[in-house]
Amino acid sequence: MDRARIARLLPETYQAAVAPHNPLGAVLAVMESLQAPAEAALASLDAHVDPLRAPPDFALMLARWLDLDRYLDWTGGRPGEGTPRYAAGLGRLRLLSLEAAELARWRGTRRTLERILTVATGLSGYAVQENPPGPKGASTSFHLRVVAPAAAQPLADLVRRIVDEERPAYTTYDIEFSAA
């Protein structure tokens, strides 16, 4: 808000006394400068809640709001200690945040598990097999086999955490990386 608009909020007696080089004018100038940062933040508020345009620190905060912090690595070794980092990069985390609501809607399904792995790592070719045959050929009930592309090997810890969090709670799983 500029000085003139602030002055219009004052009683008429004070409005008449406003001049550029008197104490009241100086107070209005200070008030104007104090409001500038808040007004700039409000003017770009929409960018802060858009995962694709949010500043990096705010993108991490959005991820935490969307319960995606379980996929962050912390430099201190434990959640909340040190600086958060996402193994597949901030760009991937932004895309995951963008799709978080839709993914949460279908959480616990094969389709969603494949989709979240694809979005989270930026790699395609994930396959989830439900009740796959065991070592003796009989199907294994309540078990998932996640087949990940070979290129996901450097992100194996992230893939494991995602499968562990997003699979149905009553299932067991194993992860295989396809041959290169």
Residue locations for each model-derived region?
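Intrinsic low-complexity, intrinsically disordered or marginally ordered coil/linker segments
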Residues: 1-180
